[in-house]
Amino acid sequence: MTGRRSDRPLIWRLTRATLPAAVGAAAVALLRRRRRPAPEAVPEAIPVTPSYAGGSGTPLVLLHGVGGTWRVWRPVLPLLERRHAVFAPTLPGHCGAERLAAGVAPSIHALADGVAEQLDRAGIDRAHIVGNSLGGWIALELARRGRARSVVLFGPAGAWRSAARMTAVATGMRLSFVLLATQAGRAEAIARRRWTRRLLLATQVEHPDRVDPAEFAASIRAMGDSPVVAPLLRVITKNPLEHLPADPDRPIRVVWADRDRVIPFERNGLPLLERVPGAELVRLAGVGHVPMSDDPEQVARLILEVTRTADRAHEKDRGASSMTPGAQPRGAS
């Protein structure tokens, strides 16, 4: 009896961690059994592109989460482009982006290398970098390499209290991803049904009805053409985020949703803050793990507050340097 009681918490944690895969399987099974056509129109297929660039101002880079594409940032793009030259690439090995080079094993460092190359090709040296989930982890690795003017993270991956639980979470995500990838050819049919959108998006967002059906269909199709995801999720928990020294010239804001059902703050946010000393924490109410569609205005505001402050400090430093004989301006565009 004693052994059974001690096992029960672990079993419960593993069950909850693999819930996304179970939800995905249930949705697909129910969809196959339903015969009546849904009343909603089939969303038009969205063409695949490797990146997005628009707006003007200081450079701002947006990095999405595992299995996604740059399109997850669409709700906030108009709000950010008023102040910044926005560059949103799809991560290497994801739908529409370049694959990892032959012989390169999937890892956080390999993805960070690929994103750094994307920035080089786009002519971006240092930029404000914003990341969600996996994109947040990559943003921190780019900051470690000196590529960040500032960093804003929404539910960043990379740290955890329990390696066993995080491995179970990654396994659940991988199984869910593999399952939905088999349905890529039916993406539009799945996305047009409100009940499947609500079921499949329940762990990702707080307000599934705010997600455009066409965008949801595009995300399902992307899963069928993202070869890096499954092997990455097999190994992602082997090397957690390393300690990132504080830098007063590179502000970091960590935003954590109060409804994050993928990587909750208590289990993942607190250990991440221990690895990123000096980071500012903001708790965001009423949104899920991917908050851009839940509350685009709040997300944009939390980004622009940081970039505006960093840009002003940068300009002040440049002005002070220009008044000092022989001094060189700090930073680069």
Predicted regions and their residues:
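Catalytic histidine-centered segment of alpha/beta-hydrolase-like enzymes
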Residues: 287-300
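Conserved alpha/beta-hydrolase catalytic His-Asp/Glu region
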Residues: 187-247
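Conserved HGGG/HGGXW glycine-rich cap/lid loop of the alpha/beta-hydrolase fold
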Residues: 52-99
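Conserved loop-alpha-helix segment in the C-terminal half of the alpha/beta-hydrolase fold
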Residues: 249-287
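Alpha/beta-hydrolase fold catalytic core
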Residues: 1-60, 81-85, 106, 124-125, ...
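Conserved acidic catalytic loop of the alpha/beta-hydrolase fold
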Residues: 109-127
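Gly/Ala-rich beta-loop-alpha elbow adjacent to hydrolase catalytic centers
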Residues: 131, 135, 139
